Swiss-Prot record:
InterPro entries: ArgE/DapE_CS, Bact_exopeptidase_dim_dom, DapE_proteobac, Peptidase_M20, Peptidase_M20_dimer, Peptidase_M20A. The lineage of its organism: Bacteria, Pseudomonadati, Pseudomonadota, Alphaproteobacteria, Rickettsiales. It comes from Rickettsia akari (strain Hartford). It is an enzyme of class 3 (hydrolase). It catalyses: N-succinyl-(2S,6S)-2,6-diaminopimelate + H2O = (2S,6S)-2,6-diaminopimelate + succinate. Zn(2+) 1 binds at residues 69, 103, 166. SUPFAM superfamilies: Bacterial exopeptidase dimerisation domain (SSF55031), Zn-dependent exopeptidases (SSF53187). Pathway: Amino-acid biosynthesis; L-lysine biosynthesis via DAP pathway; LL-2,6-diaminopimelate from (S)-tetrahydrodipicolinate (succinylase route): step 3/3. This is Succinyl-diaminopimelate desuccinylase. Catalyzes the hydrolysis of N-succinyl-L,L-diaminopimelic acid (SDAP), forming succinate and LL-2,6-diaminopimelate (DAP), an intermediate involved in the bacterial biosynthesis of lysine and meso-diaminopimelic acid, an essential component of bacterial cell walls. Zn(2+) 2 binds at residues 103, 138, 355. PROSITE patterns: ARGE_DAPE_CPG2_2 (PS00759). Its EC number is 3.5.1.18. GO terms for molecular function: acetylornithine deacetylase activity; cobalt ion binding; succinyl-diaminopimelate desuccinylase activity; zinc ion binding.
Length: 381
């Protein structure tokens, strides 16, 4: 059934933060199989409103919760996709193509199939199975998982262990389980000099040489050497803007943006202090003024492998005959919200084609993921 569910889910044009009926489809399916469900819409303005779902079967402990998102990233060029339609699932050569196939409608489809089969085959099992789904993960992630978790806890629900279905595997299904994530901090730097004619540089103060020096040092600095589970922290320049359309004018100001993905040796605040010390030094040397702004929507985190995390890893190894590694690589995810409530693993399909043209998953990989999810429910419940 996971192929059927995935094809249906791909058919919803749920470009973040839109839901396009995907949540309602899952809600209806789970209701038909005895789940208690509730859809909540959060967001003050219509343009910000996000659709969320919590569904649970049973009320006993432990509550195993699948956390995921139905929203997908936008598609730029439909013509380059199979059948010219990223929102119409295409089955070719043992693969399912479509936007969201791996990130992360495929994992949702697998856990839907695994949980419904488990309930059918194991009447009277101990514990509970639940879903927490949102349409706001690929975007601002403001009114999705974060708010929904708080809401269900206010209603008296408690999650004992969560599986976040992000595409975590690298080369084959089962090779990677994520137990943490790097943090992310964005910087915007404005430097003000003095405009003038390029023929009279002594009557101006060009802010660009200062910016070049700053960015050169920032991009060459070694922030750390990494840790056991984290790669080294990394800074990337994402934008430089002068706003100068002519070649004979020294600009009055310049702006640069950069991002740091950091491990648990840092915080956004300590990095901002380190960055500003470098900026301040060069701006003083070049006699220019600056303004530095930074914002962080995600700090780094790492979990000590709990009993259930280790149990999940054993199920992966037993099911797929591959020993998974614990990792924290990649971008941010909603796991950063879930970890405040319960232990978790992030485990899903291969990440190779996520967000790409002709995103796809192998049907054989869907079967492997289904098997892991089903066998974990058997083991724990």
């Amino acid at each position: 059934m996971y192929i059927h569910y995935l094809k249906d889910l791909i058919g919803f044009k749920s470009v973040t933060p839109e839901n396009d009926g995907a949540i309602e489809y899952i809600d209806d399916l789970l209701k038909q199989h005895g789940f208690k469900t509730e859809i909540k819409i959060f967001g003050d303005f219509k343009s910000e409103q996000v659709t969320n779902l919590y569904a649970i079967f049973g009320r006993n402990e432990p509550n195993i919760c699948f956390v995921g998102h139905v929203d997908v990233v936008p598609v730029d060029n439909h013509a380059l996709w199979h059948n010219s339609s990223p929102f119409k699932a295409s089955k070719q050569d043992g693969k399912i193509y479509g936007r969201g196939a791996v990130d992360m409608k495929g994992a949702i489809a697998c856990f839907l199939a695994a949980s419904l089969d488990f309930i059918k085959n194991n009447a009277g099992f101990k514990g509970s199975i639940s879903f927490l789904l949102t349409s706001d993960e690929e975007g601002k992630a403001k009114h999705g998982t974060k708010e929904m978790l708080q809401y269900i806890y206010d209603q008296g629900y408690k999650v004992d262990f969560a599986i976040v279905g992000e595409p975590t595997c690298e080369k084959e299904i089962g090779d990677t389980i994520k137990i943490g994530r790097r943090g992310s901090v964005n910087f915007k730097l404005n430097i003000d000099g003095l405009a003038g004619h390029v023929a009279y540089p002594h009557k101006a103060n060009n802010p660009l040489p200062c910016l070049i020096k700053i960015l050169h040092e920032l991009t060459n600095i070694r922030l750390d050497e990494g840790t056991e589970f984290f790669q080294n922290s990394n800074l990337e320049v994402t934008n430089i803007d002068v706003g100068n359309e002519t070649s004979n004018v020294i600009p009055a100001s310049t702006e640069a943006s950069f991002n740091i993905r950091f491990n648990n040796l840092h915080s956004a605040e300590t990095l901002a202090k380190q960055v500003e010390e470098i900026i301040k030094r060069y701006c003083k040397e070049y006699k220019v003024d600056y303004k530095l702004e930074y914002s962080s929507f995600a700090g780094s985190f790492i979990q000590n492998p709990s009993a259930k995390i280790k149990e999940f890893a054993k199920v992966v190894e037993h099911t797929l005959k591959i020993k998974p590694k614990f990792s924290t690589s990649g971008g941010t995810s909603d796991a950063r919200f879930v970890k405040n409530y319960c232990p978790l693993v992030e485990f899903g399909l291969l990440s190779e084609t996520a967000h790409k043209i002709n995103e796809y998953t192998k049907i054989s990989d869907l079967q492997k993921l289904y098997d892991v999810y089903y066998n974990f429910l058997i083991k724990i419940l």
